[in-house]
C-alpha cells in the first residue's frame, strides 16, 4: 500500500466549533469517479470533514460539468470557500466553476512529490481525515504501488479520493 501506516484508526471526529478557513479539493472524472473533499482549517490542522464521490459506472450514467458543479455547491453548503483546488486536466469543469463565481486553482500534479507531502502531513498531524469520509478511508486501504510497472508508480485504481487529497496537500496544506 502507498500509505501503509494509515488505517481506520487514523480517522478523526469532525472538530466541534467553527473553522478558520474552508477549501474544496476535486479529482474530476467523466467515466471515472469524481471525488470532492471539503476541508476546514482549525488550529493549524486541515480536516477533511465531508466529501462527495460520484462513480458514473456504478450509477449507470455520466454527470455533466454542471451536475458536478451542483454537487460541489451542495458540499460547500453555504460555507465561505476560500478556493477550490482542482484536477489540472479538468479544463471544462474548471471553466464551469469559474463561471459560477468560484475561485479555482489548478492543483500541483506531481504524483510522487504529492504522495510524499501527503504522507508527511498525515504523520505530523497536519492533515486529518474525518470519520464520515468513507470513500477516502476506503481508498487509503486499497491505494497501492504498481509492482509490474517498475519504478515508483501507483496503480490507477482506487485513486480518486487519493488524487483529490494529494492535490490538496501539495497545493494548500
Q: At which residue positions do the language-model features occur?
A:
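ATPase catalytic-site recognition across NTP-hydrolyzing enzymes
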Residues: 1-28
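Acidic catalytic cores of enzymes that act on phosphate-bearing nucleotides/polynucleotides
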Residues: 18-50
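Alpha-helical architecture
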Residues: 25, 137, 157-161
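Short, well-structured alpha-helical interface segments that form or flank functional binding sites
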Residues: 31, 92, 159
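Mg2+-dependent endonuclease catalytic cores in nucleic-acid-processing enzymes, primarily RNase H-like
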Residues: 37-156
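Acidic, Mg2+-coordinating catalytic module of metal-dependent nucleases/exonucleases
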Residues: 155-173
Amino acid at each position: 500500500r502507498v500509505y501503509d501506516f494509515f488505517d481506520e484508526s487514523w480517522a478523526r471526529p469532525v472538530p466541534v466549533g467553527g473553522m478558520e478557513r474552508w477549501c474544496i479539493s476535486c479529482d474530476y472524472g467523466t467515466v471515472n469517479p469524481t471525488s470532492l473533499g471539503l476541508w476546514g482549517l482549525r488550529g493549524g490542522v486541515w480536516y477533511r470533514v465531508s466529501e462527495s464521490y460520484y462513480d458514473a459506472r456504478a450509477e449507470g450514467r455520466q454527470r455533466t460539468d454542471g451536475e458536478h458543479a451542483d454537487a460541489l455547491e451542495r458540499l460547500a453548503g453555504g460555507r465561505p470557500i476560500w478556493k477550490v483546488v482542482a484536477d489540472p486536466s479538468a479544463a471544462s469543469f474548471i471553466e464551469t466553476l469559474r463561471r459560477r463565481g468560484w475561485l479555482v486553482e489548478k492543483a500541483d500534479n506531481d504524483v510522487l512529490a504529492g504522495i510524499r507531502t501527503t504522507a508527511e502531513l498525515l504523520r505530523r498531524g497536519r492533515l486529518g481525515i474525518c470519520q464520515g469520509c468513507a470513500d477516502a478511508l476506503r481508498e487509503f486501504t486499497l491505494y497501492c504501488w504498481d509492482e509490474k510497472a517498475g519504478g515508483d508508480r501507483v496503480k490507477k485504481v482506487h485513486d480518486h479520493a487519493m488524487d483529490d487529497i494529494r492535490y490538496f496537500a501539495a497545493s494548500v496544506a
